Structures are given as C-alpha cells and as structure tokens.
Amino acid sequence: MKHYEVEIRDAKTREKLCFLDKVEPQATISEIKTLFTKTHPQWYPARQSLRLDPKGKSLKDEDVLQKLPVGTTATLYFRDLGAQISWVTVFLTEYAGPLFIYLLFYFRVPFIYGRKYDFTSSRHTVVHLACMCHSFHYIKRLLETLFVHRFSHGTMPLRNIFKNCTYYWGFAAWMAYYINHPLYTPPTYGVQQVKLALAVFVICQLGNFSIHMALRDLRPAGSKTRKIPYPTKNPFTWLFLLVSCPNYTYEVGSWIGFAILTQCVPVALFSLVGFTQMTIWAKGKHRSYLKEFRDYPPLRMPIIPFLL
C-alpha cells in the first residue's frame, strides 16, 4: 500500500513546520492534526486550521487524505485559531450569569436600590411572574446544554466567551434593574396583558424545547451527521413546514412574550437585538441546507414564515 508524505507549512510565512512520513491514505485531517501536535504540542488539534491553500477554507476533520486533490506528497497550510474553549463551557457560563444576576436584583440585595429597599419584595404580581419566567428560561437553557444539545464543533475561540458574557450578562442586569425597581409600573392593560404575554411565553418555550429535541434526534451521539429536519408527531415541530430554524422563531417569540409581560424597554431592545442576530444565523443555516440538500423543501424560509 502506497503511503503519503505530508508537509505542513505556516499559512502566513510559508515556513516549513512539520514533515510527516508514511501517512496512511485513509488518514483523516483529524488524525493528521494529532500527528502534528506531537511535534508542536502548543498547538493542540482544536486550535489548528489546516487547508490546501494558504487563503483557502479550513479542511474538515473528517476529510480523508486520499480523497483530497493532492499527490502522494501533500502540502497543507496551518493557521493558529488561538486558544479554544468548549461550547459546553461557554454556554454554561453565559447562561448561568443572567440567572444569578437577575436574582440579585429580584431580591434587592444591598447597594442596588438604596438601603431602605434592601431585601424588600415588590407588591406587583407581574414582577414575581417575570422572575419565574426569566429563571425558567435560563434553567431550561442550562439543562439543554448539559443533556440535549449535540455540538457539531467541540470548541470556539476563548475570546468569544467575553463577548458573549458581556451581551447576556449586561442585558440581564439592565432589564432586571428596571423590572425589579421599587418604582416599576405594571403593564398598561393589567391582567389581560399579563395573561396574553404568559400564554405567548409558555407556548414558545415549549416549542423551542420541542425543536431542540427533534434536532437532537437527527444527530447520533458523537457524530457530525446532518439531515433535513422534518416535522414529527409533536405539533410544535410542524413549524418545520414553513421555516428552517423554528427554534429561533420560538426563541424570539418567547422574548416578545416577556417584553409584553414586563412592558420594559430593555427587554424590547434585547428582543430586537436577539432577533437580528438569530436572523443572521438562520439565513446562514438556510443557505447551508439549500447547498447541501438538493431536495430541500422550497417553501421554507429561514426564520419567519413567508417573509424572512
């Protein structure tokens, strides 16, 4: 059996970093990364990007050497992705923060609203409902991270955790400050507005969870398999008939419900920013589906049925 020789060069300087002799033709990029780490332990596999061209796209870990457009002497170009951190760690950190921060304002710990309000409780029922909804949302996210989500990528750049936490933690503090403020004003339309908002929030939370479970069942544990998601017997998944990312649709709906419930400007802004970001993600995933699957349902839109 003919073996390959693999030369790894720096994508920026073209400097030769490593030469691997007698590499199996069936070796994957993941295995080549492991071999490279043996000579350069500071660059563990998760922070390596290997490509055929210095300015080209990164090769996938599952790509097989003999199936790449290279000869028996292959040249790969290396880029350092920087320090990496697991997606699970990032999600747990960015979701635990808002849960804890919101409760600090809810219980009115000292140095927030003034001494006379320390550890006092709001007289408005909607404030307590808002705390329950907010806490439920982030506890759900934490549990889904631990027991439901299956990540196609194991890590992300370490710097992202600071950006993500600033976003989630900052908005949580901003909205919690006003919702739990001693001078907070309840919703204009009273009980009817609260009931409507709670219904929207609960339905969308159930829908979001249902979509996450459906997506989980599409990907076997430990794999990166991608399939077209279709509706199941669960009515909440029927939104797959119209959009590619109904989990985002339900997520946006949850925050709209929370904004109606609290009638709070920071919540409305958080919903708007979240919708903008999730629309970008949804469009990206929608394009990937269309590119990867020729039989992808043509009626689907990225996030909003018939519109967007």
Curated annotation (Swiss-Prot):
BP term (GO), one: very long-chain fatty acid biosynthetic process
TM annotation in the entry: 87-106, 125-147, 159-180, 190-216, 246-262, 265-292
Domain of life of the organism encoding this protein: Eukaryota
PTM annotation: Glycosylated.
Pfam family, one: TECR_N
Entry's Gene Ontology cellular component terms: endoplasmic reticulum; endoplasmic reticulum membrane
Catalytic activity annotation: a very-long-chain 2,3-saturated fatty acyl-CoA + NADP(+) = a very-long-chain (2E)-enoyl-CoA + NADPH + H(+); octadecanoyl-CoA + NADP(+) = (2E)-octadecenoyl-CoA + NADPH + H(+); (2E,7Z,10Z,13Z,16Z)-docosapentaenoyl-CoA + NADPH + H(+) = (7Z,10Z,13Z,16Z)-docosatetraenoyl-CoA + NADP(+); (2E,7Z,10Z,13Z,16Z,19Z)-docosahexaenoyl-CoA + NADPH + H(+) = (7Z,10Z,13Z,16Z,19Z)-docosapentaenoyl-CoA + NADP(+)
The organism's taxonomic lineage, starting at the top: Eukaryota, Metazoa, Chordata, Craniata, Vertebrata
The family this protein is said to belong to: Belongs to the steroid 5-alpha reductase family.
Keywords: Acetylation, Endoplasmic reticulum, Fatty acid biosynthesis, Fatty acid metabolism, Lipid biosynthesis, Lipid metabolism, Membrane, NADP, Oxidoreductase, Phosphoprotein, Sphingolipid metabolism, Steroid biosynthesis, Transmembrane, Transmembrane helix
Protein name as catalogued: Very-long-chain enoyl-CoA reductase
Topological domain spans for side Cytoplasmic: 1-86, 148-158, 217-245, 293-308
Subcellular location field: Endoplasmic reticulum membrane
InterPro entries reported for this sequence: 3-oxo-5_a-steroid_4-DH_C, SRD5A/TECR, TECR-like_N, Ubiquitin-like_domsf
Modified sites of kind N6-acetyllysine: 22, 60
Function: Involved in both the production of very long-chain fatty acids for sphingolipid synthesis and the degradation of the sphingosine moiety in sphingolipids through the sphingosine 1-phosphate metabolic pathway. Catalyzes the last of the four reactions of the long-chain fatty acids elongation cycle. This endoplasmic reticulum-bound enzymatic process, allows the addition of 2 carbons to the chain of long- and very long-chain fatty acids/VLCFAs per cycle.
Pathway it works in: Lipid metabolism; fatty acid biosynthesis; Lipid metabolism; sphingolipid metabolism
Primary location recorded for the protein, binned into one broad class: endoplasmic reticulum
A GO MF term: very-long-chain enoyl-CoA reductase activity
Complexes and interactors: Interacts with ELOVL1 and LASS2.
EC assignment: 1.3.1.93
Topology versus the membrane: Multi-pass membrane protein
PTM-bearing positions, type Phosphoserine: 58
Lumenal side of membrane: 107-124, 181-189, 263-264
SUPFAM superfamilies attached to this UniProt entry: Ubiquitin-like
